[in-house]
């Protein structure tokens, strides 16, 4: 668990569910996701994001952001790879929370002997691309014109970070 002067980073817990669902509805829009994302139910959310599958940045009881992680596939030969996604509440952006979450994710990956973190980012989200690059992620692939959003074709960029043992 990491602590700064304003927030703590800890694993997600069942009581965080409503705030995490609300945060997803707030941050995943046409600039950050192929389609806005809204969970149909608490049960659906918990099936996809069980407690402990995210690291949260919290101020008191308020969730400021998260980084979610799960095995990239169910194949045993791919268990050294985590797929991740990160979200920070708009109110809490530009104060180091995303960087702290990413650092905590890298540390957790080392502890769990994960060797690679991967993520996907839309080409229409240059701020996120710059952030991931700053965090050491490399572009491994690009699915050109993968999505058609608001009358424009958008690429899906595949980025990865390799954990040093």
Feature names for model-found ranges:
Residues 20, 24:
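Hydrophobic pocket/interface hotspot
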Residues 94-107, 130-134:
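Conserved acetyl-CoA-binding loop-helix of GNAT-fold acetyltransferases
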Residues 71, 118-121, 133, 138-154:
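Conserved catalytic-core motifs of GNAT/GCN5-like acyltransferases
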Residues 62-65, 127, 153:
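Glycine-rich acetyl-CoA-binding "A-motif" of GNAT/NAT acetyltransferases
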Residues 109-120:
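Conserved GNAT acetyl-CoA-binding A-motif
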Residues 2-3, 152-165:
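Terminal substrate-recognition subdomain of acyl/acetyltransferases
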Residues 7, 14, 26-91, 102-103, ...:
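Acetyl-CoA-dependent GNAT
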Residues 102, 125-128, 145-150:
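Short glycine/proline-centered loop/turn elements that form peptide/ligand docking sites
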């Amino acid at each position: 668990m990491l602590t700064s002067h304003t927030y703590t980073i800890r694993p997600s817990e069942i009581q965080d569910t409503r705030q995490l669902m609300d945060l997803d509805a707030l941050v995943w829009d046409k600039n950050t996701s192929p389609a806005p994302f809204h969970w149909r139910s608490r049960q659906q959310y918990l099936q996809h994001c069980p407690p402990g599958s995210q690291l949260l940045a919290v101020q008191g009881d308020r969730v400021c952001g998260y980084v979610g992680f799960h095995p990239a596939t169910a194949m045993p030969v791919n268990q050294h790879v985590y797929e991740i996604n990160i979200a920070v509440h708009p109110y809490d952006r530009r104060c180091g929370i995303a960087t702290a979450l990413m650092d905590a994710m890298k540390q957790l990956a080392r502890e769990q002997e994960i060797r690679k973190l991967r993520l996907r980012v839309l080409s229409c989200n240059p701020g996120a691309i710059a952030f991931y690059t700053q965090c050491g992620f490399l572009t491994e692939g690009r699915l050109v014109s993968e999505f058609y959003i608001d009358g424009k074709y958008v690429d899906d960029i595949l980025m990865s970070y390799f954990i040093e043992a």
